[in-house]
């Protein structure tokens, strides 16, 4: 978790045959692994009017950081961004996306590239904005996301999005909001992932400490801790 290797660009909008002819706009993606294949999910618009033509594309590879080939996009999803794919212990995969206060989720077929039924709204999320992430801890499902917080904090700096979470007994809810687990960074919005590595849980997020510009963000990671009742402690952001 200290020494990292930059493997370079793994996908470009020029490789997306159904994408907007002007290219660009490949925003926050996700990647899942199943049966020897890595599935890379990315939001990309298909038309010049990019704001209303988002699709969730799928590219696959047998390696995690190279060789990805675009296979198409998932049909039947609303034009939203920020895909998240969660594979449960029984092998069933779920996909989520959202933005603008809307969060939806649904089952994926075994091929990981088609919906198994309809996407449905995720009920019970308090002040949802974007950046869905789902993980499982002690038999419970956790859905984390960035909120719409936009108030001043005690340091006088314009407030940015906080990271919230909700808990459920089902990967598709209904969800019970549990509050905030990360205060704002300096990059306006935030997009977090919660993962376990060698017995320790970590919170991945981003800030703009290196660039000084809230649209040029760097990946950060800090340890994450649960309370005995399953709630998440506020993550301490380190430098």
List the predicted regions and their residue ranges:
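Carbohydrate-active catalytic/glycan-binding domains of CAZyme proteins
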Residues: 1-239
